């Protein structure tokens, strides 16, 4: 069992129940899924770029990503309908908790000039999104084998009813929010 999953079930549920003033433990917010998205607009020009991006995302997530394709042609961006423009992967269960553990303990502290995560990135329903400018913050990525620095979006979907519950959940997991 993943370390954070065990920690959530044994300690955080009881702590959050009293902290949020909930009656039932089933009301306690939990993390449903984590979605990683990497936009690769240059893949329209060179197919190798998409391969490198897929390999990076596979190493980070531990699971094969899905290629996202453009929905319509846009002349200004020089893309056509159906061309590959990105990759995404959705993590659930143990893989999700293992990724969250690596994100909190290793990747976020390795971000250059890091001053804390913005608490304004909640969507109003308790879900949190953050962007990372460099994929090399993750230990799975070998710096010498990286062709170019790419960023990725991380969306954490929770069962929280509002932003306050979502913030309390992520803070309990150890997310370093700005004060």
Curated annotation (Swiss-Prot):
Keyword annotations: Ribonucleoprotein, Ribosomal protein, RNA-binding, rRNA-binding, tRNA-binding
Ribosomal protein among keywords: yes
Record GO terms (molecular function): rRNA binding; structural constituent of ribosome; tRNA binding
Pfam families: Ribosomal_L5, Ribosomal_L5_C
Keyword Transcription: no
GO cellular component: ribonucleoprotein complex; ribosome
A biological process term (GO) from this entry: translation
HAMAP family reported in the protein's UniProt record: Ribosomal_uL5_B
Family of this protein: Belongs to the universal ribosomal protein uL5 family.
Role, per record: This is one of the proteins that bind and probably mediate the attachment of the 5S RNA into the large ribosomal subunit, where it forms part of the central protuberance. In the 70S ribosome it contacts protein S13 of the 30S subunit (bridge B1b), connecting the 2 subunits; this bridge is implicated in subunit movement. Contacts the P site tRNA; the 5S rRNA and some of its associated proteins might help stabilize positioning of ribosome-bound tRNAs.
Entry-linked NCBIfam families: PRK00010.1
Designated name of the protein: Large ribosomal subunit protein uL5
Origin species: Francisella tularensis subsp. holarctica (strain LVS)
Gene: rplE
């Amino acid at each position: 069992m993943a370390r954070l999953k065990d920690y959530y079930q044994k300690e955080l549920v009881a702590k959050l129940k009293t902290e949020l003033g909930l009656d039932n433990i089933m009301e306690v917010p939990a993390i449903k899924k984590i979605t990683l998205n990497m936009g690769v607009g240059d893949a329209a020009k060179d197919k190798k770029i998409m391969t490198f991006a897929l390999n990076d995302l596979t190493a980070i997530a531990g699971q094969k990503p899905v290629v996202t394709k453009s929905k319509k042609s846009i002349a200004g961006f020089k893309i056509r309908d159906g061309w590959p423009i990105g990759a995404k992967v959705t993590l659930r269960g143990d893989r999700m908790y293992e990724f969250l553990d690596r994100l909190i303990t290793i990747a976020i502290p390795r971000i250059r000039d890091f001053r804390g995560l913005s608490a304004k990135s909640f969507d109003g329903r308790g879900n949190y999104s953050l962007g990372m400018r460099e994929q090399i913050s993750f230990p799975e990525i070998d710096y010498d084998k990286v062709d170019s620095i790419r960023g990725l979006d991380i969306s954490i979907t929770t069962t929280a009813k509002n932003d306050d519950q979502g913030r309390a959940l992520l803070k309990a997991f150890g997310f370093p929010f700005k004060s």
